[in-house]
Design a protein with these regions (language model features):
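Non-cleavable N-terminal signal-anchor transmembrane helices
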Residues: 1-27, 276-285
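C-terminal cap/linker of serine protease catalytic domains
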Residues: 204, 236-285
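A conserved mid-domain beta-alpha-beta active-site/ligand-binding segment of alpha/beta enzyme cores
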Residues: 190-206
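Short glycine/Trp-rich loop-beta-loop segment that forms part of the substrate-binding cleft
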Residues: 129-178
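Catalytic histidine site
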Residues: 14-116, 154, 176, 182, ...
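"Short basic amphipathic alpha-helical interaction patches in structured regions
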Residues: 66-72, 121-130, 165-168
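Catalytic nucleophile loop of clan PA
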Residues: 205-237
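Internal, conserved structured core segments that host functional sites
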Residues: 104-128, 146-147
Length: 285
């Protein structure tokens, strides 16, 4: 007889997914200082020998193919300062979006040069393997499995000037959301699989006024193994969706569903990059 398992997400869950996350920053000038504005979120992914970032189509459309952008990570081990830049002229992109606001699918992928990907890995970034099936079961007899969901992304309104100033610029603190889903509602819109999420703030004091910046962020399905005492012993993850719009009251987020992610992989990414060979032996991440 199956038993429903209730899991409360806390800070211990952030590590398994936040190391996959990245925010995009668009640079500008204000007087003599450089400015950085959050433009959305993405997830580090890989397929065969191809490395890149999966995000929303409308996020990537705001970034010119020849401009240099900032990449801000939300690592489990926080560095003192980040200043990573990516010249998009050295990348290639595919977009699955018709250009109409709020229409789905709204997905995009931008490749990363191997040198950048390797350096990101060396600094703790983890690339989610799009070529692996994700099926999880308890590793020990008698253990139970539970499922919960979490949304990860940049919150634009939480971006603020940092305390430290520098000769050629200033420090910017970029706020990130790791939000446990209070409700998860899969539905179809014009035949496309979407997921609507309402985030719970029971475990955190900050509630954003909007989800600006979260677009392109991952909706994770977390498969949690619990021992006989109900203690979490393992957390596995599956990319369940990619956020792309918020509700009119700014309380809910809608994500592209898993089938739409599978479609861009099959129809756009694999045909565009010969090195994206899902049949090649790969190590799970």
């Amino acid at each position: 007889m199956s038993q429903e398992v209730t899991i409360k997400i806390d800070d211990s869950f952030t590590g398994p997914v936040c190391d996959y996350s990245v925010g995009f920053l668009k640079f500008g000038r204000q007087g003599n200082h450089e400015t950085a504005t959050p433009m959305g979120t993405g997830t580090f992914v890989k397929l065969g020998k191809l490395y890149g970032i999966l995000t929303a189509g409308h996020v990537l459309k705001e970034l010119e193919p020849n401009e240099t952008v900032g990449l801000v990570r939300f690592p489990s081990i926080q560095p003192a300062l980040q200043n990573r830049r990516l010249n998009l002229a050295h990348t290639k992109r595919v977009v699955d979006w018709n250009g109409k606001e709020c229409d789905a699918p709204d997905l995009a992928f931008v490749s990363l040069p191997e040198v950048d990907a390797r350096d990101l890995e060396a600094k703790g970034g983890i690339f989610y393997n799009l070529g692996l099936p994700r099926e999880f079961k308890a590793g020990t007899e008698g253990h139970r499995m539970g499922t919960c969901y979490a949304l990860v992304g940049v919150v634009g309104e939480w971006t603020e000037d940092g305390a430290a100033a520098f000769l050629k610029g200033k420090k910017i603190d970029v706020g990130g959301l790791f939000g446990s889903a209070k409700t998860v509602r899969p539905f179809k819109e014009d035949g496309k699989d979407l997921v609507e999420i309402e985030v719970s703030y029971e475990t955190g004091p900050r509630v954003p006024k909007s989800y600006g910046g979260v677009s392109g962020g991952a909706l994770w399905e977390l498969h949690v193994e619990l021992d006989l005492a109900g203690k979490v012993v393992a957390v596995n993850k599956k990319l369940y969706g990619v956020a792309f719009r918020e509700s009119g009251d700014k309380k809910r987020v809608t994500a592209n569903g898993a089938s739409l992610i599978d479609a861009i992989v099959k129809n756009e990414i694999i045909p565009s990059w010969p090195e994206a060979d899902p049949e090649a032996p790969m190590k799970q991440a």
